[in-house]
């Protein structure tokens, strides 16, 4: 039986095959020809000027009203929530809690348990969420910056209203008819112990307060630039998601790349170190043009690792590689605007004109 080649061996093989020297990305290099490869996805081309119209995102503290419900007057307070938040309360009950708005009795019973439960950690979680999100000045500023930059690119898109809520570990972000929501109890830190009961370890990386703005913007982009069901090949999915990541990075100019994609710094460094090997493995297996759902899910969906590449890799490597290709495409075609990029649906053309050769 032919031994399974490790990613590291594949990496070395691909470099040897191309007659080049293997160099780790975190080494200091003096070879000018490699500079373009080493600068990563931080495309510094100025697509959005500094002097743009500022927009103010309205943040509604529904979470505070939720947690002000009193155990001895739950029904009365729930009725008041419907009156005070008639726009959002039905969305919250049906979309987040998956209950009928007409079933007030069950909602009150569930809410009583939600306020006092200590087994699942709801009471402790609610208290911590209130404390961590007591001051949202930084969140407000970051949202204003992100949506101001997006408004410059797409002024026809309506700025959403953002509600903060506690979800009972049901939802991180949501979007419905230009109303967005953030489940603040899902952003209490990747080391928050009660998350061990509700999510896998690999999912906890983005359950941090710093990820709220990126998650909101990412969902907003996905809603306004919907996925085309005709994208049935891996290449098309990679380029589509890569374009979304490129746009998201322009809205978060002060965020490092690993935060934009939701990796740890160590995961990002691993990808950069083995980028050539990753690409060689994809090409060697001819995965770019595969349509099998197992292959697509392995590359594009979140998971502990990308099974098609290596158990040492982070998940969603297809997204990461797609972003690298799109970034290379924009670097090598500086006259292309972001609008033109987002309206270019020929994934093969983007790949060819990216000159992506890690």
Regions from the language model: what does each represent?
Residues 5, 15-29:
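Bacterial N-terminal signal peptides that target proteins for export
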Residues 290-358:
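C-terminal soluble interaction/assembly domains
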């Amino acid at each position: 039986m032919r031994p399974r080649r490790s990613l590291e061996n594949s990496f070395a093989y691909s470099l040897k095959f191309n007659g080049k020297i293997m160099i780790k990305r975190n080494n200091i290099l003096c070879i000018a020809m490699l500079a373009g490869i080493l600068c990563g996805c931080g495309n510094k081309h100025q697509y959005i000027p500094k002097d743009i119209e500022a927009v103010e995102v309205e943040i509604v503290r529904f979470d505070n009203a939720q947690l002000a419900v009193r155990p001895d007057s739950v029904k009365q307070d729930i009725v008041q929530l419907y009156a005070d938040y008639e726009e959002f309360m039905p969305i919250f009950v049906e979309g987040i809690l998956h209950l009928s708005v007409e079933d007030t009795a069950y909602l009150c019973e569930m809410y009583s348990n939600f306020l006092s439960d200590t087994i699942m950690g709801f009471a402790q979680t609610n208290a911590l969420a209130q404390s961590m999100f007591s001051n949202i000045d930084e969140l407000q500023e970051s949202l204003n910056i992100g949506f101001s930059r997006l408004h410059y690119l797409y002024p026809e898109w309506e700025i959403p209203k953002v509600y903060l809520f506690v979800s009972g570990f049901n939802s991180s972000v949501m979007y419905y008819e230009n109303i967005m929501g953030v489940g603040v109890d899902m952003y209490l830190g990747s080391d928050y112990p009660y998350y061990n009961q509700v999510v896998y370890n690999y999912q906890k990386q983005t359950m941090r307060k710093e990820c709220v703005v990126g998650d909101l913007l990412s969902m907003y982009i996905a809603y306004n630039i919907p996925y085309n069901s005709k994208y049935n090949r891996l290449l098309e999915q990679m380029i589509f998601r890569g374009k979304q990541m490129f746009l998201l990075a322009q809205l978060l100019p002060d965020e490092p790349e690993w935060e934009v994609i939701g990796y740890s710094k160590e995961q990002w460094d691993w990808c950069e170190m083995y980028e050539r090997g990753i690409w060689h493995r994809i090409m060697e297996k001819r995965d770019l043009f595969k349509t099998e759902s197992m292959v697509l899910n392995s590359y594009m969906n979140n998971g502990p690792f990308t099974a098609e590449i290596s158990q040492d890799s982070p998940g969603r490597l297809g997204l990461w590689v797609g972003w690298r290709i799109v970034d290379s495409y924009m670097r090598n075609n500086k006259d292309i605007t972001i609008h033109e990029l987002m309206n270019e649906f020929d994934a093969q053309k983007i790949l060819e004109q990216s000159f992506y050769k890690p």
